[in-house]
Amino acid sequence: MTDAKKDGFAHFDLGAMAKSDSYKLLASVIMPRPIAWVVSRDAEGLLNAAPFSFFNILSADPPLVAIGFSAAADREGKDTLTNIKAQGEFVVNLVPEELAQAMNITATNAPRGVDETRLAGLELTKCEVVNVPRIVGSPVGLECKLFQVIETGGTGTIVLARIVYAHVRESAFANLAKLYVDPAQLRLIGRMHGSGGYCTTRDTFTIDRLSWPLEGKD
């Protein structure tokens, strides 16, 4: 923590902090985060599943997602990154409330050679483009092809991937023809602080977008 400025804030110089402390701080304030439940396949065909919350969509044209991996991550994170680099494809499944415990099982530090999809009892189905299955219980499955790997120069690696095919549970649409999704029907969870903090996405509110010029504003 930097000098106390008595302004009601704690101040941090991230460059002077231990990496574990900066991770702890940032992961506790940048939230909630969506969770990419990644299914990948190794060169021998063995499946791997692991959740990652350093994840989001970065572009719609082309449709790109980003996933952050840490060298200090558990074995699963390393296996997933290795598979993505070697095979160039994977599936991002979004996590519904009812599969939270199964997702947590796939986050364990299982040894290499363990198929976490079987360990968690997940039902899988074939994808349309990539040679990796998606999780049936997930309301959203995104088939992805590797776009770019960015080595950050620190302990992290960022994977950019192009979404080539999307699967969205039909019952989640308020109007399929207009692509209106009812988020409440997805029942997705997000990552919060600490080693086991999560949130639901059921408690939402709506604010209408404003147009310029703003009424009552000079």
What are these regions (language model features)?
Residues 1-218:
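Basic, polyanion-binding surface patches
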